Amino acid sequence: MDVMKYNDLRDFLTLLEQQGELKRITLPVDPHLEITEIADRTLRAGGPALLFENPKGYSMPVLCNLFGTPKRVAMGMGQEDVSALREVGKLLAFLKEPEPPKGFRDLFDKLPQFKQVLNMPTKRLRGAPCQQKIVSGDDVDLHRIPIMTCWPGDAAPLITWGLTVTRRPHKERQNLGIYRQQLIGKNKLIMRWLSHRGGALDYQEWCAAHPGERFPVSVALGADPATILGAVTPVPDTLSEYAFAGLLRGTKTEVVKCISNDLEVPASAEIVLEGYIEQGETAPEGPYGDHTGYYNEVDSFPVFTVTHITQREDAIYHSTYTGRPPDEPAVLGVALNEVFVPILQKQFPEIVDFYLPPEGCSYRLAVVTIKKQYAGHAKRVMMGVWSFLRQFMYTKFVIVCDDDVNARDWNDVIWAITTRMDPARDTVLVENTPIDYLDFASPVSGLGSKMGLDATNKWPGETQREWGRPIKKDPDVVAHIDAIWDELAIFNNGKSA
């Protein structure tokens, strides 16, 4: 797995600029709604990452649309193009369930994977670029950061790409997660993490082990792309996101201890927010326009109090927006789809392809094609998708087709559904399952149903009827017509010879 080298976000931006993948905007643009409008138009056109050098009212530039194309996501993961992300998935599958070499030849084949593992340990620094400037106490003022307001109905400016660092009591490994954070004061943000996410679980354990004590939290803004992407990739529970970022980058992730707590943050981050959550302190969060294309409900989440802001000289603020696909999360989903395939195939070798259509909000609907081997096989695969990776916990619909269907072609998939399914026999409904809190269509917040569609050819035991045979053309006739096609001149507005 060849790795595209860069050390930090600034290195990566230089790389993008050299390849025509970064546009500097010198015209003053307002972080209130205007940057979103420009970024949205650019993303939909497949355009470059955008660096707004003069956001109105601020001296700090804003980076947007960084992961606006699958190619840039692949570059962030150290690869030349999206197809190479299958190799990242194979590496993750190997790390999830490593197998000892079966012999010398197998050892030689696995050698590149073992060499990459050498980049997993973090490198701890005494001082770091992210601590070149330090502000604390009453001098902390989040309003100096050009935090974007993305949609007209949004409650307040919103931090979107904050890499939140937490740790459970008596644990060495840290958790990295991306959670949006609503600005509610000069030193206060609302930490919107769902109850099953790593940060929330760390907080729950802390509260149980240390009643009444403040929970330390740090948030890195403008971390290097490998570290950001490591936080949204299905990394095995035994592997830290920093370690995985080192694998992607090809160099050890450099970290530094925070000024006010023992958490370790990316040494090259542009900005770091340090602080705590006071147990029991919550605030109503939202509404905000979300990746579903709707404003979400208002709900209460913990308040993050910022005690220190550390940053690099001439720091860059990295931001994005979320809305009805396509948006950056949808583009990330398209790229990460390629990472998921080898992981699923290692557990279920019968899977030929797996596809999360971006118009399905990146994860709410999945299409799986399989080499069917027995009656009921499709139902086993449905259950496997829902249970194997936590990323698919909220997938509402799973469609399973045979391997003669292209999972990424709706014409093929709809044909399979309408010709190979009996709705009563081939539909699986599972009630009272975990559902995305943002899914207002579910009857209860966080709890709803799932549907599996078995659009495979039916085997004996699944049907008593003679099954239809697909129409296939005569290859000799096809070859003959190919040979005389130009002479027919059907589309040339002329006469055949």
UniProtKB/Swiss-Prot annotation:
One of its GO terms (cellular component) is cytosol. SUPFAM superfamilies: FMN-binding split barrel (SSF50475), UbiD C-terminal domain-like (SSF143968). It catalyses: a 4-hydroxy-3-(all-trans-polyprenyl)benzoate + H(+) = a 2-(all-trans-polyprenyl)phenol + CO2. Keywords: Cell membrane, Decarboxylase, Flavoprotein, FMN, Lyase, Manganese, Membrane, Metal-binding, Ubiquinone biosynthesis. Prenylated FMN binds at I178, Y179, R180, R192, W193, L194, R197, G198. InterPro entries: UbiD (IPR002830), UbiD-like_C (IPR049381), UbiD-like_N (IPR049383), UbiD_bacteria (IPR023677), UbiD_Rift_dom (IPR048304). It comes from the Bacteria. GO terms for molecular function: 3-octaprenyl-4-hydroxybenzoate carboxy-lyase activity; metal ion binding. It is a peripheral membrane protein. Homohexamer. PANTHER family: 3-OCTAPRENYL-4-HYDROXYBENZOATE CARBOXY-LYASE-RELATED, FERULIC ACID DECARBOXYLASE 1. This is 3-octaprenyl-4-hydroxybenzoate carboxy-lyase. It comes from Shigella dysenteriae serotype 1 (strain Sd197). The lineage of its organism: Bacteria, Pseudomonadati, Pseudomonadota, Gammaproteobacteria, Enterobacterales. The gene is ubiD.
